[in-house]
Amino acid sequence: SSDAFTLVEEQVAYWVGGDRIATSLEVAGWTTFEWLHFLAQLPQSLTTSQLAELDQAFELTSSGNAEIVHQWLLIAIRNDYLPTRDRLERYLLAIGRRKLVLPLYQAMAETADGRSLAMNIYRQARPGYHPITANSVDAVLGWSE
């Protein structure tokens, strides 16, 4: 409901504004949709210490929810948050859904370091992807056999 999303937005504002630390945010009982909304409402640019605080408080890197991990990894890639690198690789090797893997490769492809990482992961992951997914990632990375 929109009321639930308003409460999520309040928690983001408290944290971003420095009024509350992550562990004091009211997140008990949040659904996947509320967590996704929380992650979507975060500022585009976050520091390593801010990301570490969120990760330690909410265990986002180790979440078992593919959608939540997807959003978290996008944020991590955008902000060059290195502690998620192993999880990113495991995720891209385990998940084959185009809608979950393509945006991650696109985000990595925006920087030279990211593109290099993407190519290394993709070299291993590509054989397990559906041909449509592989074709999409091929185009993003300029992949050729």
Could you say what each language-model-derived stretch is?
Residues S1-E145:
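Long, ordered, helix-rich scaffold segments
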